[in-house]
Amino acid sequence: AAAAVSVLAACAGNTMAPVASGKPAPFFVSSTGSGRGGDLGGLDGADRLCTSLAAAASLPGRTWRAYLSTQGAGGVNARDRIGAGPWANVKGVVVASNVTELHGANNVNKQTALTERGDVVNGRGDTPNNHDILTGSQPDGTAITGSVDTTCGNWTQSGAGAAMLGHSDRTGLDESVPAK
């Protein structure tokens, strides 16, 4: 489950809670993985990783959520974990106004899907290409159904299973609107 591959996760400030500043909640692509491949300690561990990375980058206090789905009984959709939007990158550029836009005609691309420190993530054409993001999700942000593991055992395994990935630069995907 991605044990030997460097993969990233996307983190979003949950906007279900009031945002005192009136600004969109930040959205970032993590610059650092757990060091254990797809074993992020489940959703709670992944959320803690997002919170830790945000705190280290002095991002405003939010309830941080990893953009990850889980499978099986009690499965969770990534799109349902991150609030209603809007979301902006750490430089204030709005990447999506709402959940529908986030999973459709959004502004997520190589120049806007920044790390928590505001750095561009290496993508297609860069060495190394680090655009793979763990999601365990379909392009619309819902969990993948069926018996094939696409979440590294719901983000608790690094030696077995597989993970569905997205691309932070949105290149190399199919040409459908949700995949772009």
Question: Where is each model-derived feature located?
Answer:
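Bacterial N-terminal signal peptides that target proteins for export
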Residues: A1-A2
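C-terminal motif of bacterial Sec signal peptides marking the signal peptidase cleavage site
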Residues: V7-A10
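Secreted/extracellular ectodomain signature
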Residues: G13-K180
